[in-house]
Amino acid sequence: MTQKRVLILTADAGFGHRSAAEAVEAALAELYGDQCVTKVVNPLDEADAPELIRQLEEGYDEMVVEDPALYRIAYHAMGTPLVADIVEAFATRLLNDVMLRLVQDFQPHVVVSTYPTYAQPVALAIKETTQDIALAVVITDLTDVQSLWYSRAATMHFVPTSLIRQQAYDNKIPATRVWVTGLPVHPAIARETRDPLVLRDTLGWMQEIPTGLIVASARTQQMATISRLLDRAQIVLQLAVVCGGDGELFRRLQQVQWHGPVHLYDWVDNMPQMMKAADFIVSKAGGLIVSESLACGLPMIISEALPGQEVGNVRYVVENEAGTWAPGPAEVLATAFSWLKGTPPQLDAVRANAVRLGKPRAAYDIAEGVWGLA
């Protein structure tokens, strides 16, 4: 049996890039088993990665939380051709050695990149090996992406929406090298087909009352207030609050005297089950959480968004009526009330739109595309 080898490059600036990489890896394993050998690597974690560029990744969370205005300026600057060209040249120079070593060590048939600044450095590394290695780019935001994502050296761009497809065309990428697949979410979402009431029973939740899922992290600022406000509202509602590994928030919420049924979690690895058991979700507008929610047909109340790509994610959800933008606890409460208690209740219509937009099998489609390139 001839095995195919796939090297998947990712980053840890935010959750979405690694989650997309792991979704593609899981789909390849499920579809092709031992015929496919995969490796997910963050080049910036490698010992020979330059310290300067590693520090830029490590400072991402701090800048997002403590100085969003600076993040906004940096993001929009990256969207200008001159700055993008400078960043691309800078990254290519600094990452060339580590990229070349990774490719030479693993000997892949295909390299998959889920991070924008990797495309050109790995394309150069592939060229230097003089081997026939395909390069695939998986774009992890829904509407607004920087030109760094697009590489004329890439064999294929797997893009989440028709909007990104048009942007690829505008960046001189041929139509034969662009495939609209959706953003890859873990195959567990497509596999989970149990009835929501069964899932609630499995999770230890009450079965017969509406359920809101609140997803927080160290990057969110309002979820504690939102949780308390929804709990005290005159709505029959149970809450499941996932703190995303933010231990301080988890401990603080454990001290609250809750009025209704509230289930608290520090970190979970069964988000697909929770999403499919809930009636709606309150979250920020990261590409991963938006794509997972839509893949589960879960109406979204988006309470926070980073400048740049997350603003585009909000626009995508709102314009398609699969959720709403509620930038404050009072707005979140008003939306939940109208969805559950309005005349008529609006939740079913929003859910239908989320189902229409969702791409639960995107990771499988990308895996099949990658396999075809090998």
Residue ranges and their predicted role:
Residues 23, 27-102:
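Conserved N-terminal ligand/cofactor-binding loop architecture of enzyme catalytic domains
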Residues 103, 131-133, 147-156:
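A conserved, positively charged/aromatic
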Residues 155-217:
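A nucleotide-sugar donor-handling region in carbohydrate enzymes
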Residues 195-278:
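Donor-nucleotide binding loops and adjacent catalytic segments primarily
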Residues 276-286:
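Acidic donor-binding loop of glycosyltransferase active sites
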Residues 346-360:
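A short, well-ordered alpha-helix in the C-terminal region of glycosyltransferases
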Residues 359-374:
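C-terminal alpha-helical cap of glycosyltransferases
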